[in-house]
Amino acid sequence: LLEMVKAVVTNRLALTVVISDIVRFTGYYVLFSMMVYQCTAVIGDMMAMTYVLSSSSLFAILGNVVAPMVCSKLGGRKKTVALFGLITGLSFASIGIFGQTTWGFTICCSLAFFFMSFIDTLDTMLYMDAGEYWLYKTGKDTRPYLLSMYNVSVKAALALSSVVLGIILVAIHYEPGVTLTGSAASTLTWATGLGPGLGYLLPV
């Protein structure tokens, strides 16, 4: 067990991938919670969430179909993940500008989910790369363990997302049941966009 932990803590590649995924997934889960506040308190229509999720899911499927073909032509996995992490983060951040309407929120999320699919295509391979590096460096095969760290990253992010969500709502002085307008609506919209946006931009 100690050797397995060491394979993550002292393996720079593995540690980078795990931390990056925790940050990314935290932003991802925060978005799903913030969607509820955005649709009810800013857009004023809970049905908007149905449109956003339906469109985003379709674009994510489309992204998963084309991503393998595109990624295979772009070269290095780390650079490709960084590139699409940047594009995904900016797509989420654009919610702050366009997200106060149903159409704007839907388009921004759909684009982000499309580009996110390119990261998902390569993400688990980065864990394998970290395992290959450790095998080359030490002669010890920890690849199965490192691949399992993907699930650990997801669960850690899920736990962190509730904390981050609470911090965001306190920071913007959110009041339940109030339809926001003006600067208050703008603040919540930016929080909705920057939550996942920073989650994808920071690991870049």
Go through the PLM ranges and name each one.
Residues 1-204:
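Membrane-embedded alpha-helical bundles of multi-pass transporters/translocases
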